[in-house]
Amino acid sequence: YLWRQDGSFVSSKKERAGVRNTAMDGSDQVIRETVKRCIDSLIEESHIEESQVQGIFCSGMLTSNVGLEEIPYLCAPVDERALCNAIECRFFNDITRIPFYMIPGVRNHVENIGIDTLEQMDVMRGEETEAVALLRERGKGEDLIFVLPGSHTKIIYANEEGYICRCKTTMSGELLDALFFHTLLKDSLPDFFVGEEEYDYQAVSDGARTAQKNSFTSAVFKTRIYQKYVHKDKKKAANFLLGVLMYYDCLSICEFKKTEALEEVQFVIAGKRIIAQAVYDILTDIMQEKKVHLLDEDELMAAKGAFRLAELYYKWKEGE
């Protein structure tokens, strides 16, 4: 994502390659070549020179051991200033001469991590940067739980002072993909996952209520029974499966709220629209949560957070 210094968005470039390649191949060559290609294309298509770009701010898995370089996690609680102060500058001359500024991930504060404290421990890379943008939009003064559905669903507690305090992760997005394309259920589902216009509230609700009465693996298999005997429409079956998985995510969200002893917390859901909609519907209709806000999908959320941290970084650096 390319931004002007005044905060206006210029352009973006995406490619289907990522840290998964590094994890599978044991080499970071693909990710480095992909990052270089995207940067070169952005510069060329925006008709600017490399020297005009002040810096490249990275968050997420690019700052992990399967990214460009691993940057240690910050220990929660952290605010945007703490994140900004922990940014580390790196140069990768095989990619570009522009300096990279690596935004660290955040981990829960847990002493003596072991099997007895495993439940308390979790980490995030990238979502803390999204949380910075969300906190800027919402403002301080209230306890918030951000729910960020995607390949993983990240549940983040930010307190009324604007500190990111704790997180919890589920793998529902990756599980949905695996179940959809790599199990027996493939025969009961459409060739591609349903789009936003094909979202079916009733089928999602059917899946969630089935999950209430069954174990996870049993509820998942009920997708096949649902398509075979209840609704032949495979798109309805896809929505049913979505409801099953998101029910268990919503269980995790409610348990997270209880663990943090948050009575008056506001839930803010931001992420892939169809998954976010399912989370919203299950939280409000089945879990009976009242203070739930569903935001429009914003693919610039992480980029907005990174730009905010870049602003602060240069401002404080100049003030030193």
Language-model-detected regions and their locations in the chain:
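Glycine-rich phosphate-binding loop plus the immediately following alpha-helix
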Residues: 20-26, 107-210
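Short glycine-rich, Thr/Ser-proximal phosphate-binding strand/loop in the N-terminal lobe
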Residues: 1-30
